[in-house]
Regions:
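Short, small-residue-biased leader/transition segments that mark boundaries at the very start
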Residues: 1-6
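Pore-lining transmembrane helices
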Residues: 10-20, 24-264
Length: 264
């Protein structure tokens, strides 16, 4: 009985220490996700305007509602649904390792699977929808731009050729500006996520290494709890990386928009 009381006392202290560091990691993950989302909300209207000026009116019209909805809704899903699921799983691991008789392993695994599945569904749906609509609208814009240039060149007397060249010049310069803004956007996202990701990777490594080192000399429940904390940090890290990946792909697609202009 004394051994059980002593274990639970040590376990309670360990839980408090692990919870403190895990809450810090949650705060870091939320700040990064919200920071990237705020930056995308600021830069996207500029990029959409440049796409429209470069002749990609259909692309701008179709991408804009998808993009703005994604920038608002996806980070909110991560912050209000996925991260709380990770937190619940983290807490349940403590309860699971408190007793040797009564276990909830399957419930913990189920929550972990839900977290991974939701992220996978969001990433796949977002990238597939964005790619399909981008390809379709690119074809429409290419035909529309060539038709406009042909009509101006052939049906406006004397100055038609000059107007046609002016349209191409404005579209080309808009394309250059858009590509520069997209490149800057990619670099800013890297700067936003770099330090937090390094911090979370190091914390995960510390917990995994700690679990490996104390395993020969400690109760298996303590080892399991420390390892589970590392697993929860991996899930948090996946949230930050998946949101960043989606916005990376978004900027890359927008950077490639309007390339049909080059060469007339």
């Amino acid at each position: 009985e004394f051994r059980r009381v002593l274990f639970r006392s040590c376990y309670a202290v360990m839980v408090m220490l692990l919870s403190k560091s895990f809450l810090i990691s949650i705060s870091v993950a939320k700040d990064v996700i919200n920071g990237v989302a705020d930056f995308m909300a600021a830069i996207l209207p500029v990029l959409v305007t440049m796409i429209a000026l470069a002749g990609g009116v259909t692309q701008a019209a179709t991408i804009d509602p998808i993009v703005m909805a994604a920038v608002v809704i996806i980070p909110r899903i991560y912050v209000t649904v996925i991260i709380p699921l990770i937190m619940v799983g983290f807490v349940l691991q403590f309860a699971n390792n408190l007793s040797e008789e009564h276990k909830i392993d399957n419930l913990c695994k189920l929550l972990k699977q839900w977290t991974v599945w939701i992220q996978g569904i969001i990433i796949t749906s977002f990238i597939a929808l964005l790619t399909i609509r981008g390809i379709t609208s690119t074809t429409i814009d290419a035909v529309a731009l060539k038709t406009t240039k042909f009509a101006v060149d052939n049906f406006i007397p004397i100055v038609g050729k000059a107007f046609s060249d002016a349209i191409t010049s404005v579209a080309g310069y808009s394309l250059i500006i858009k590509n520069a803004i997209s490149g800057i956007g990619l670099m800013v996202i890297i700067l936003i996520i770099l330090y937090p990701i390094i911090k979370m990777v190091l914390m995960t490594f510390i917990y995994k290494m700690s679990a490996a080192l104390v395993e020969p000399i400690s109760d298996k429940r303590i080892t399991s709890t420390i390892a589970a904390t590392g697993d929860s940090l991996v899930l948090l890290l996946s949230c930050v990386l998946s949101v960043s990946l989606m916005f990376f792909v978004l900027l890359a697609i927008m950077a490639s928009a309007g390339k049909f202009i080059v060469g007339g």
